[in-house]
Amino acid sequence: MPSKSACLRHTEAPGQLEGRMLQGQLSNPEKKLIPTSASLPAADSQSSQTNSMPPLSMPAKPSNQNLQAKANLITPQPPIRPKLERTLSLDDKGWRRRRFRGSQEDLTVQNGASPCRGSLQDSVAQSPAYSRPLPCLSTSLQEIPKPRRATGSEGGSPSLWSDCLSGMISTSLDLLHREAASGGPHSRLASLRATHTPPAMDLNIASSSLRTANKVDPEHTDYKLRMQNRLVRAHSNLGPSRPRSPLAGDDHSIHSARSSFSLLAPIRTKDIRSRSYLEGSLLASGALLGADELARYFPDRNMALFVATWNMQGQKELPASLDEFLLPTEADYTQDLYVIGVQEGCSDRREWETRLQETLGPQYVLLSSAAHGVLYMSLFIRRDLIWFCSEVEYSTVTTRIVSQIKTKGALGVSFTFFGTSFLFITSHFTSGDGKVAERLLDYNRTIQALALPRNVPDTNPYRSSAGDVTTRFDEVFWFGDFNFRLSGGRVAVEAFLKQDPEVDVLALLQHDQLTREMKKGSIFKGFEEAEIHFLPSYKFDIGKDTYDSTSKQRTPSYTDRVLYKSRHKGDICPMKYSSCPGIKTSDHRPVYGLFRVKVRPGRDNIPLAAGKFDRELYLIGIKRRISKEIQRQEALKSQSSSAVCTVS
């Protein structure tokens, strides 16, 4: 039979562990402690021998002798200061782990093995002596054990469990107050985890390249204050005591700032510091015509171009509206550059340019204007792109004798935009059904006589030819009244046109003189033309949709054309090629083409236009628009005031 001290040491281990979980300070020595196996009745002694450690739910009234022995032999070990986060933790997983470990210890005890073999002596020997026992603090509110009753037991004391519970709660609350008073770390709640995987989205529109600015509900009370603070931070000087501006972030922040503060692209401070205007380079950071600046205005490096030709027949009367000509409904957006060539232009050239400026509006400025007799060419560009143009140069060619100097010839205008050189030529070739050879001669004289470029350097001199001006530029557009006709006679052409209003014009082009000569390679070498899907633009009765009804009975033909040529294949992409049947002030219908042209970065060491444009024409166009708007509003007012209600 084991000694009393050994048995006591063996049976006190569970009580000591449970005392650590609950609270073990004895405020009254007469209060009953948690019962142990030493105080069990004699009736249960047999079961105690079988199970060396009875379960905790089998309490018995302990004797005073056992209480005194416990107090003399056991000095509680001071508890470890629990962490505040763990004190407030409600993690079920940890509680299940502790319950599982406790169940394993109970099974070990029932099988005859002690769960704390030799640990109690070590803890008693190492624990310091205190004048009074310290409370055993719980590390979690979930560690409160529930009282368990064994069959046939007398039951535990209710006051004992209530005292332990109240002491534990008071100690935990005391810890909270001490932690807050000492300025310790803030309490953190346990992270929430999804219990199940959310269903897949029907459509995923996530994109790493798209990023928008954060939105705030305008109805929110502090919306104005927050927006004001953002603007102050964005435009404030970046000092050591100021908050960091959102414009000083990464590339995504710049795109977000563009949508938050201004439509203008933000400019980095470091780009300005490293920018040099003395010497240009394709790889220079911050160059005016370099890749960085080009990407700001043309991220895809493609500009929109409008090229049109119109033989005005020298009419003084201009159309009431040029919207159908310059602003066709097929185009959703306006173009970046407008180039208009006129043959047999009106006598008042300034009035013609004013009408163009008035129609395009204040968003466009006249970059250049040139004339050769009655050949006019006008270049309008978006006003924010005027700074990336070189000096504009022009040259003229006379192809006929002196008596015809004002009607036949060619006019060429060239300039460089960023790093791409452009050449625009408008021509009026010799007229007549059978004068194909004369028209070929006009073409050859033009490409040899146009002296361009002059001061602006060639972007690729190794691919240039002295005998062909079109080889000295990256992108070439040649448009005008070429006077090539449809062979076969008027009767055959009219019969073909009357067959079907939606006639396939490809059959007509088989009889086109220009198409035939281009296939031979005798004219416009290297040039291309977009597919034609409109009716012949010549010759109409003025103000009507009928072809020539005079005694000459001229054959309807595609005399007005727009051709293009590029050094690099695929740089020019035609988007639209059509005519304007609504403008009927001439015997020719205007023909236009919409293009997308690839633009490359350039160098700053070229003669720049430096924002030069026709300022006087710009102001006149604005005044015209204002005066017309006032007249329109007055007409609406007079119409509404003069309305008469009649009763029948």
UniProtKB/Swiss-Prot annotation:
CDD domains with a match to the protein in the record: INPP5c_INPP5E-like (cd09095)
Catalytic activity of the protein: a 1,2-diacyl-sn-glycero-3-phospho-(1D-myo-inositol-4,5-bisphosphate) + H2O = a 1,2-diacyl-sn-glycero-3-phospho-(1D-myo-inositol 4-phosphate) + phosphate; a 1,2-diacyl-sn-glycero-3-phospho-(1D-myo-inositol-3,4,5-trisphosphate) + H2O = a 1,2-diacyl-sn-glycero-3-phospho-(1D-myo-inositol-3,4-bisphosphate) + phosphate; a 1,2-diacyl-sn-glycero-3-phospho-(1D-myo-inositol-3,5-bisphosphate) + H2O = a 1,2-diacyl-sn-glycero-3-phospho-(1D-myo-inositol-3-phosphate) + phosphate
Entry's localization field: Cytoplasm, Cytoskeleton, Cilium axoneme; Golgi apparatus, Golgi stack membrane; Cell membrane; Cell projection, Ruffle
Positions of post-translational Cysteine methyl ester modification: 645
Positions of modified residues (Phosphoserine): 103, 245, 260
InterPro entries from the UniProt entry: Endo/exonu/phosph_ase_sf, INPP5E, IPPc
Keyword Coiled coil recorded: no
An individual GO BP term: response to inositol
Region (4 X 4 AA repeats of P-X-X-P): 59-243
Polar residues bias (residue ranges): 36-54, 120-129
The entry's keywords: Cell membrane, Cell projection, Cilium, Cytoplasm, Cytoskeleton, Golgi apparatus, Hydrolase, Lipid metabolism, Lipoprotein, Membrane, Methylation, Nucleus, Phosphoprotein, Prenylation, Repeat
Region (Disordered): 1-64, 99-158
GO cellular component terms given for this protein: axoneme; cilium; Golgi apparatus; Golgi cisterna membrane; Golgi membrane; nucleus; plasma membrane; ruffle
Topological relation to the membrane, as annotated: Peripheral membrane protein
Ranges for the Sequence repeats: 59-62, 76-79, 147-150, 240-243
Family assignment from sequence similarity: Belongs to the inositol 1,4,5-trisphosphate 5-phosphatase type IV family.
Job of this protein: Phosphatidylinositol (PtdIns) phosphatase that specifically hydrolyzes the 5-phosphate of phosphatidylinositol-3,4,5-trisphosphate (PtdIns(3,4,5)P3), phosphatidylinositol 4,5-bisphosphate PtdIns (4,5)P2 and phosphatidylinositol 3,5-bisphosphate (PtdIns(3,5)P2). Specific for lipid substrates, inactive towards water soluble inositol phosphates. Plays an essential role in the primary cilium by controlling ciliary growth and phosphoinositide 3-kinase (PI3K) signaling and stability.
Assembly mode: Interacts (when prenylated) with PDE6D; this is important for normal location in cilia.
Name the record gives this protein: Phosphatidylinositol polyphosphate 5-phosphatase type IV
Native organism: Rattus norvegicus (Rat)
Gene for this chain: Inpp5e
